[in-house]
Amino acid sequence: MQIHVHHSTVYEFSQPQTRLIQLLRVTPPSFSGQNVLDWSIDIDRDARMRTSTDGYGNVITMLYVDGPVDRIEIVKRGTVFTQDRFGVVTGTNEVLPPKAYLASTSLTEADDAICALAKMIERRQPGRLMLLHDLMTTIKSKMRFLTGEGDPYRMAQVAFAEGHGVCQDFAHIFCAAARHLGIPARYVSGHLYQHNGPAVQEASHAWAEAWVDDLGWTGFDIANGVCPDDAYVRVAIGLDYRAAAPLSGSRHGAGEEKMGVRVLVSQPGQ
């Protein structure tokens, strides 16, 4: 499938800023089942950009803008050819060994409730692949999905206790439970083409990957209860949202900041 992504982020400031520094994790890599045909990052003002890779192997772009700046728009766009590989991820730039993804973070720390859920599923599913599928569907059944953009920095234990959240919450809970069982798991950010849903979205999508013996890294979209197929564009990975967030950075200047995001995921010609 060919998927076109147009991801626009607009920052507006109540007072002009003297300098902006942004870290962008918005460039998808090519690997088995995903081929980036074209990709670009455009800024509506003079800026300096430097591209490299981070400690997870993600493509990152550092953006430097000198002021005065009261508004800036960052547009990421491109076309990606995808194939359905039933969630199995191969051919990626793996900088870290699987065991590195056993580390817990403040966003993926498992409390008693998440530990109990994980142990319950482990008792009824001896095989790792079936265990992970069961974990995905059980979390989905216990959580109510919220549309719109939530708080991606909410801890997994808080979201699980409240019983609702956005895709980032679902991925964090899954990672917390899997790691508690000694299964390497990681957070994934990217885009989802919705065949019967709106093309324009308010944020990027998020899911998780877990290490399965004899298969390798395998994706689980907990919010939708499926393994990623050719409707998914995989962009960045990390231990949690902080490590794979599309944008992060700092600004030099006073005043308030307002951010608007518009993501269009479509097929060419739509």
Regions found by a protein language model. Name each.
Residues T137, D169-G255:
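Hydrophobic/aromatic-rich core segments of domains that either
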Residues M1-K119:
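Linear, non-domain "peripheral" regions
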Residues M1-H4, S32-I41, L146-G148, V166-H172, ...:
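A broad, low-specificity signal for short, low-complexity segments enriched in glycine/proline
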